[in-house]
Amino acid sequence: MDKYTSRYHKFYDEVVVPKLMKELEIKNIMECPKLEKIIVNMGVGEATQNSKLIDAAMADLTIITGQKPLLRKAKKSEAGFKLREGMPIGAKVTLRKERMYDFLDRLVNVVLPRVRDFEGVPSNSFDGRGNYSVGLRDQLVFPEIDFDKVEKLLGMSITMVSSAKTDEEGRALLKAFGMPFKK
């Protein structure tokens, strides 16, 4: 049985790596930056009042990523937010290997173009080590989500962790994948 290789994984091997080696003047193929994981996080602060919201967030993340999310709980109590330690406040999925490449493919080619008034993702959201984070205002930009079944619009943050050592390397990697940065 042949192992499944996603379209973007093949694209990385055949197009992105040679392009990055030339652009970043890398001699050894193992030095070429690569994506290690993509973390999709949904913070649901209103879950303190309405516990059904966390279930909706978990279901939406499962549909979007194809993987069961991890329930995130409050680390300590905070009276100002009516929050007790151990209360569920979010959901998180860590994507690796083929699911990661499939998700990136859908994000770049389907989801981001569906965002209203989209002019590109901000190019200043790098962390100094080549990792990139972008936020989405609602989950409806994903075609898998049924508009009629959504109770509340929930935003999410998507973090792409790469082996790049600098922001320039990380930007070059994501640009080679087709990430539409603002001019």
Curated annotation (Swiss-Prot):
Keyword set, alphabetical order: Ribonucleoprotein, Ribosomal protein, RNA-binding, rRNA-binding, tRNA-binding
Lineage, top-rank taxon, reads Bacteria
> Cross-referenced Pfam families, in alphabetical order?
Ribosomal_L5, Ribosomal_L5_C
A GO CC term attached to the entry: cytosolic large ribosomal subunit
What is one process in the GO biological process aspect for this record?
translation
What InterPro entries would the database entry show?
Ribosomal_uL5, Ribosomal_uL5_bac-type, Ribosomal_uL5_C, Ribosomal_uL5_dom_sf, Ribosomal_uL5_N
GO molecular function ontology, one term from the record: tRNA binding
Provide the family line. Belongs to the universal ribosomal protein uL5 family.
What's its job?
A: This is one of the proteins that bind and probably mediate the attachment of the 5S RNA into the large ribosomal subunit, where it forms part of the central protuberance. In the 70S ribosome it contacts protein S13 of the 30S subunit (bridge B1b), connecting the 2 subunits; this bridge is implicated in subunit movement. Contacts the P site tRNA; the 5S rRNA and some of its associated proteins might help stabilize positioning of ribosome-bound tRNAs.
Its quaternary structure? Part of the 50S ribosomal subunit; part of the 5S rRNA/L5/L18/L25 subcomplex. Contacts the 5S rRNA and the P site tRNA. Forms a bridge to the 30S subunit in the 70S ribosome.
Q: Could you tell me what this protein is called? A: Large ribosomal subunit protein uL5
Its source organism is Fusobacterium nucleatum subsp. nucleatum (strain ATCC 25586 / DSM 15643 / BCRC 10681 / CIP 101130 / JCM 8532 / KCTC 2640 / LMG 13131 / VPI 4355)
